[in-house]
Amino acid sequence: MAEIKAAQVMELRKKTGVGIMDAKKALVASDGNVEEAIDALREKGMAKAAKKNDRIAAEGLAGVAIDGNTAAIVEVNSETDFVASNDQFKALLKDIAETIAKNKPADMAAAEELPMGEGTIASSVINLTAVIGEKISFRRFELVEKNDGDHFGSYLHNGGQIASLVTLEGADDEAAHDVAMHVSAVNPQYVSREDVPAETLDHEREVLTEETKNEGKPENIIPKIVEGRVNKFLSEISLNDQAFIKDSDQTVAQFVASKNGSVKGFVRFTVGEGIEKKENNFVDEVMGQIK
């Protein structure tokens, strides 16, 4: 029996989209021959999925599932927004989120191999790809844990184009939901200004200093102006300092404090962020249709 290397498993997964264990089993059966392994997987009903693996899945939905003190936020992609609105696609997203929250996998490799339905998460994704005829991809997830006295809040914008998950220490579920809505709408980068990395702050201060100098401000007041602008920058990227979307007369921190709580953390997924979408040339597209 040939030794199966990690690089072979990765290559087969890249070409077919199957899970780690399915790829390894196919390689073992084919004595390490990747092309034979692909054929074997196709014979098991994965051919259609394998042929679509070079397509870009940049649409889709994000969702949240809560299981006791554990919450999972996940993203599942499709090639078109039409498929993302399909009930089967929505059911897959829901099942994946619930499975992740319940089983708490350590990483994507472990998540893909979790039992779900009649197979695994990975096989369920491949099966739906074959049924719908469009590449489906389970892209990412994040797990969040809370204590008994904490509260989770989630909010889905536009049906799941943006998903936010917030954890409050104290307060209540309604407050957590409202803060999650704020996170979806305003997109803060950090919980508090203390969380902003020093290098980010130093860079911003340097840029603002040069900007202020170029405005011709008197040298003696430049430091004060810069610090004012730095504070404005921090208030724009820090959740606690942002004006609360439902009441701009108070900050998010003030709103949560009024509910006897504080913000512990948040996660925000925007569908397709970081994925380079394929742009078709219009002339090439027309020519392709008339060939």
UniProtKB/Swiss-Prot annotation:
Assigned keywords, A-Z: Cytoplasm, Elongation factor, Protein biosynthesis
NCBIfam families: tsf (TIGR00116)
Function: Associates with the EF-Tu.GDP complex and induces the exchange of GDP to GTP. It remains bound to the aminoacyl-tRNA.EF-Tu.GTP complex up to the GTP hydrolysis stage on the ribosome.
Gene: tsf
Family: Belongs to the EF-Ts family.
InterPro entries registered for this protein in UniProt: EF-Ts_dimer_sf (IPR036402), Transl_elong_EFTs/EF1B (IPR001816), Transl_elong_EFTs/EF1B_dimer (IPR014039), Transl_elong_Ts_CS (IPR018101), UBA-like_sf (IPR009060)
Identification of the protein by name: Elongation factor Ts
The keyword Protein biosynthesis is assigned to this record: yes
PANTHER family listed in its UniProt record: ELONGATION FACTOR TS, ELONGATION FACTOR TS, MITOCHONDRIAL
One GO cellular component term: cytoplasm
Lineage: Bacteria, Bacillati, Bacillota, Bacilli, Lactobacillales
Keyword ATP-binding assigned: no
Recorded GO MF terms: translation elongation factor activity
Subcellular location: Cytoplasm
